[in-house]
Amino acid sequence: MMLLLAQWLQGMSSELGFLRVFQYLTMRAVLAALTALLIGLAAGSWVIGKLMALKIGQPIRGYAPQSHLSKSGTPTMGGVLILLSIALSTLLWFDLSNRFVWIVLLVTLGFGAIGWVDDWRKVVDKNPEGMRSREKYLWQSLIGLMAALYLVFCISENSNAKVLELFISWMRSGFALDLPPKAGLQLPFFKAVSYPLGVLGFVLLTYLVIVGSSNAVNLTDGLDGLAIMPVVMVGSALGVFAYVTGSAVYSRYLFFPHIPGSGELLIFCAAMAGAGLAFLWFNAHPAQVFMGDVGALALGAALGTIAIIVRQEIVLAVMGGIFVAEALSVMLQVGWFKYTRYRYGEGRRLLKMAPLHHHFEKSGWKETQVVVRFWIITMLLCLVGLSTLKLR
């Protein structure tokens, strides 16, 4: 919005040439981060007060660690503050004609809506489990598949008109259309090496990345500040990749696929970082508010969608290693318990408790130790991911 306003004002008077500074992507990214940060800090206390007035307090599951019982009643659904800050800042500073930012915004808000319903049922219906798993996955799958079907052609072509033509060609070809190399699975540490996926393969991968990332971040959000800081770190790193893939010069120099328009995602990533830091101000131990599913599901979906657009799905798994570990810990715990119950008549556990952060709590780590150590690990993993920019 500000970009269009600056361009309009420049056309009105030659004396306003200094407004050309808003054409620089990096400048708008800095302003987006600051805007989201200020919105979050300014509105945070008001949002928390409203949540408390509405008695939207976090119910604690009966099997949670004893140390968590004191958190019962802490306002949840604070993710609304994050999404509000991201949306307002992004709309203010990005190029409104950019299709990639719009799709990320829509996916983020769509998953946020799912999380909102889930949280609402928890606090209003007094059901700690919220939405039924099948219902939640149904809506997640619907949004994920819709995004995947659009992105597979959107990444392959540079305009929406050509996207429609490519879709029609795919239908007429009997669903056997070849995609350009940039739509393949990019292998890190190799120069211009990609594995062809085809349309259906791309759609399946996109669905798994978006839905998987969403639920992985949601599982990680179990301790004060645990999920939000890794989201900020990974999102910021993905912003760097977006800047590179969106630049014809840098992408060619670093042997990355050039995705015209993807650089504008740096604005969204910057806004997400600013909003995340503002939320951390209130979510740091002892937390004044929890983000809830409305925040966790949305932020995870945003990370997954951005990674798909900039073709860094594998790098996302590396940088978001904490999210991957948390999700795997739950799957392995549940799978092993069911297997041993079937095999031996008694369910057994691999971990003291899942997700993984609860295992370390049960092992004697303090909550703040788990959180900060997971932050440190994420920072190191992000550095490994960023090293793939040059180590190819």
Curated annotation (Swiss-Prot):
Cited function: Catalyzes the initial step of the lipid cycle reactions in the biosynthesis of the cell wall peptidoglycan: transfers peptidoglycan precursor phospho-MurNAc-pentapeptide from UDP-MurNAc-pentapeptide onto the lipid carrier undecaprenyl phosphate, yielding undecaprenyl-pyrophosphoryl-MurNAc-pentapeptide, known as lipid I.
EC number per UniProt = 2.7.8.13
Q: Which UniProt keywords apply?
A: Cell cycle, Cell division, Cell inner membrane, Cell membrane, Cell shape, Cell wall biogenesis/degradation, Magnesium, Membrane, Metal-binding, Peptidoglycan synthesis, Transferase, Transmembrane, Transmembrane helix
Q: In which pathway does it act?
A: Cell wall biogenesis; peptidoglycan biosynthesis
Its source organism is: Verminephrobacter eiseniae (strain EF01-2)
The cross-references to InterPro entries, in alphabetical order and at most eight, read:
Glycosyl_transferase_4, PNAcMuramoyl-5peptid_Trfase, PNAcMuramoyl-5peptid_Trfase_CS
Gene Ontology terms describing biological process: cell division; cell wall organization; peptidoglycan biosynthetic process; regulation of cell shape
What name has this protein been given in UniProt?
Answer: Phospho-N-acetylmuramoyl-pentapeptide-transferase
Classification via HAMAP family: MraY
Q: Which CDD domains match?
A: GT_MraY (cd06852)
| Any Gene Ontology CC annotation | plasma membrane
Among the GO molecular function terms of this UniProt record, one is:
metal ion binding
- Would you identify the family this protein belongs to, as annotated? Belongs to the glycosyltransferase 4 family. MraY subfamily.
Q: Which reaction does it catalyse?
A: UDP-N-acetyl-alpha-D-muramoyl-L-alanyl-gamma-D-glutamyl-meso-2,6-diaminopimeloyl-D-alanyl-D-alanine + di-trans,octa-cis-undecaprenyl phosphate = di-trans,octa-cis-undecaprenyl diphospho-N-acetyl-alpha-D-muramoyl-L-alanyl-D-glutamyl-meso-2,6-diaminopimeloyl-D-alanyl-D-alanine + UMP
Query: Would the keyword Membrane turn up in this protein's UniProt record?
Result: yes
Q: Corresponding gene?
A: mraY
Query: Membrane: present as a keyword of the record?
Result: yes
Pfam families noted in UniProt = Glycos_transf_4, MraY_sig1
